[in-house]
């Protein structure tokens, strides 16, 4: 059967598939035609993102249906740098009066506006 894949640029790609084809196969066919790696592709049908392990028939995709192709966001940070960033940003003390960020072993606030308060708390940890 024939299905259509529409990109965000408005370009429509025609693919020859079977209902038993899984989503990974469809993404591989898109890669063959357009050169977009499957790990960067997200396919949407009827407002739902299609999961790799499922088949076209699981989503009730019929002949001449239109799928929408969007690309994953690029960027991010290397995993080893995430750990370093969390440590750098979280190992601080916070003044409860003026909310100043202080070094981890601080006993008193360094700001004059709170009277160099000793009312400090540890900075809350970031969630994953």
Swiss-Prot record:
Keyword Manganese on entry: no
One record GO biological process: modification-dependent protein catabolic process
GO molecular function, one term: protein tag activity
PANTHER family attached to this UniProt entry: UBIQUITIN (PTHR10666)
Organism placement in taxonomy: Eukaryota, Amoebozoa, Evosea, Eumycetozoa, Dictyostelia
Glycyl lysine isopeptide (Gly-Lys) (interchain with K-? in acceptor proteins) crosslink residues: 76
Protein name, entry field: Ubiquitin-ribosomal protein eL40 fusion protein
Similarity-based family: In the N-terminal section; belongs to the ubiquitin family. In the C-terminal section; belongs to the eukaryotic ribosomal protein eL40 family.
Other notes: Ubiquitin is synthesized as a polyubiquitin precursor with exact head to tail repeats. Some ubiquitin genes contain a single copy of ubiquitin fused to a ribosomal protein. In D.discoideum there are 9 genes: ubqA: 5 copies of Ub and a final Asn; ubqB: 1 copy of Ub and ribosomal protein eL40; ubqC: 1 copy of Ub and ribosomal protein eS31; ubqD: 3 copies of Ub and a final Leu; ubqF: 7 copies of Ub and a final Asn; ubqG: 5 copies of Ub and a final Leu; ubqH: 5 copies of Ub and a final Asn; ubqI: 4 copies of Ub and a final Asn; ubqJ: 4 copies of Ub and a final Asn.
Annotated organism of origin: Dictyostelium discoideum
């Amino acid at each position: 059967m024939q299905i259509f894949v529409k990109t965000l640029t408005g370009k429509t790609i025609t693919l020859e598939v079977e209902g038993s084809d899984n989503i990974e196969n469809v993404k591989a066919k898109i890669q063959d035609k357009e050169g977009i790696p499957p790990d960067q592709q997200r396919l949407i049908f009827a407002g739902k993102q299609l999961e790799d392990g499922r088949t076209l028939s699981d989503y009730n995709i019929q002949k001449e249906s239109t799928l929408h192709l969007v690309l994953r966001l690029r960027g991010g940070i290397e995993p080893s740098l995430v750990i370093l960033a969390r440590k750098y940003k979280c190992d601080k003390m916070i003044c409860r009066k003026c909310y100043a960020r202080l070094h981890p072993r601080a006993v008193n606030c360094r700001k004059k506006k709170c009277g160099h308060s000793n009312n400090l708390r540890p900075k809350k940890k970031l969630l994953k």
